[in-house]
């Protein structure tokens, strides 16, 4: 059984501020979810082949087709900053 103190601790670690009502609600909801997982763990799946999907699905994405775009200047004109033929963006990683 999930205790309210456990929900409060996880909320604190996640930097979430819960009201008393939310804490009670999440304790009940998460407890129900954990009970369901407990039921699932009782199933005999020894004969079930491991899979990542419930149904067999093949690649459903479309094929990418490269389409040249010759008006590079108009795209670069929209950039807040550029260098030569490239977008210039702020550095996000420090020196290592």
From Swiss-Prot:
EC number(s) per entry: 6.3.5.-
GO BP: glutaminyl-tRNAGln biosynthesis via transamidation; regulation of translational fidelity; translation
GO molecular function: asparaginyl-tRNA synthase (glutamine-hydrolyzing) activity; ATP binding; glutaminyl-tRNA synthase (glutamine-hydrolyzing) activity
Top class in the EC scheme: ligase
Domain of life: Bacteria
InterPro entries, A to Z: Asp/Glu-ADT_sf_sub_c (IPR036113), GatC (IPR003837)
UniProt keyword list: ATP-binding, Ligase, Nucleotide-binding, Protein biosynthesis
Catalytic activity of the protein: L-glutamyl-tRNA(Gln) + L-glutamine + ATP + H2O = L-glutaminyl-tRNA(Gln) + L-glutamate + ADP + phosphate + H(+); L-aspartyl-tRNA(Asn) + L-glutamine + ATP + H2O = L-asparaginyl-tRNA(Asn) + L-glutamate + ADP + phosphate + 2 H(+)
A Pfam cross-reference name: GatC
Keyword Ligase: yes
PANTHER family: GLUTAMYL-TRNA(GLN) AMIDOTRANSFERASE SUBUNIT C, MITOCHONDRIAL (PTHR15004:SF0)
Quaternary assembly: Heterotrimer of A, B and C subunits.
HAMAP family xrefs: GatC (MF_00122)
Assigned protein family: Belongs to the GatC family.
Function: Allows the formation of correctly charged Asn-tRNA(Asn) or Gln-tRNA(Gln) through the transamidation of misacylated Asp-tRNA(Asn) or Glu-tRNA(Gln) in organisms which lack either or both of asparaginyl-tRNA or glutaminyl-tRNA synthetases. The reaction takes place in the presence of glutamine and ATP through an activated phospho-Asp-tRNA(Asn) or phospho-Glu-tRNA(Gln).
Annotated protein name in UniProt: Aspartyl/glutamyl-tRNA(Asn/Gln) amidotransferase subunit C
Species for this entry: Acaryochloris marina (strain MBIC 11017)
Gene: gatC
């Amino acid at each position: 059984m999930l205790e309210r103190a456990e929900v409060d601790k996880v909320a604190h670690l996640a930097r979430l501020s819960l009201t008393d009502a939310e804490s009670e609600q999440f304790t009940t909801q998460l407890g129900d979810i954990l009970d369901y997982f407990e039921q699932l763990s009782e199933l005999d799946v020894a004969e079930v082949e491991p899979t990542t999907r419930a149904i067999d699905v093949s690649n459903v994405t479309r094929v990418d087709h490269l389409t040249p775009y010759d008006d590079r200047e108009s795209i670069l004109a929209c950039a807040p900053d550029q260098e030569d033929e490239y977008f210039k963006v702020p550095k996000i990683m420090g020196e290592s």
